[in-house]
Amino acid sequence: MGQINILIGSNGSGKSNFLSFFEFLNKIYEQKMTEYVALNGGVDKFFHKGSKVTDVIQAEVFWKTNRYQIQLKEGDGRFVVAHEKLGYAAGSMIYYNDIANYTNEAGIKQYKGLKRGDYINNYLTEIKKYHFHDTGKTSPFTKESHIQNDRYYLYEKGDNLAAFLYAIHEETPIVYNRIVKVIQSIAPYFSDFYFHPTAANTLRLQWRDKYSSMVYGPTDFSDGTIRFIALATLFLQPTPPKVIIIDEPELGLHPVAIQKLAGMMHVAASKGTQIIVATQSTDLLCHFKPEEVITVNQVEGATQMVRLNSEDLNHWLEDYTLGDLWKQNIVKGGQPE
């Protein structure tokens, strides 16, 4: 995968499955695999076309010379970690060391052996798939968060957005002001967030309008605006995670907000964050190079992913945007609706 990876493809092509793999990998690392599988349909749903067709899941992820490999099999209605290994590439040779065999959960989190395990641990702990789609009256954005316990990193569903923004406000005001200005660029009426911790050090997301003295809550934003606020906080935070994974971040966003979103994604990537995003938006696609875009298609029941190449599209890109080429089926990747 590259630094920026924009996945395009039709519904059912496998984009969401691919993103969910990283979510699954994080649960494996956190030793929450059994719980995650049980809450998401059980073992059979995770096998390609069910356990009658597939009897093993194997994955290998690698960063430069370091590798992590895991193999899962079914045992008594649940997954068993059949093999778990660390790998190291030296030229054309790859050397593996066992971490665990036939255990209920992965062992990489507690691994204290080879130094490459520390490197892989640092990477796996920061793999998060973010979901900011729920914006209703009981959404994660409406929850109280603790200004001490919930300040360290943004949670996957934005539950601690208030406490995380408060921490940025207190510790890195320059970054905080940048986030506020970006929000104002798509919501001119927005003045600032209103931070008023309770005696118990909890906080709700509140804000003020430029034209009123009232204090508002998250449900007073439009769906698109509260999503944009979460996205701006995610991508512009002082130290973004090593990997940001998100499915259809453009949902509910105005074209101007989508343009801002693309810019924020590039900012995070420039700081070393790897971006993996699935989209159906031609507006978003227009802001990326062909080499940053991967087409996803289902071929004979399997997902096929192909990265675009500028040389193949230069003639077309003189007159059309990448989004136009996708609409016109010149870029093959499940045409946008």
What spans do the regions from the language model cover?
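Phosphate-binding P-loop
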Residues: 1-2, 236-239
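Pre-Walker A-like glycine/lysine-rich segment at the N-terminus of P-loop NTPase domains
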Residues: 1-54
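Catalytic acidic motif of RecA-like/P-loop NTPases
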Residues: 5, 23, 250-251, 256, ...
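Walker B beta-strand of ABC/ABC-like P-loop ATPase nucleotide-binding domains
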Residues: 8, 244-246
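Short beta-strand segments that buttress and anchor functional surface loops
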Residues: 57-63, 207
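Electropositive, glycine-dotted interaction segments
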Residues: 64-185, 191-194
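Conserved ABC ATPase signature
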Residues: 174-177, 181-236, 246-259
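C-terminal lobe/lid and adjacent interdomain/linker elements of RecA-like ASCE P-loop ATPase modules
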Residues: 260-337
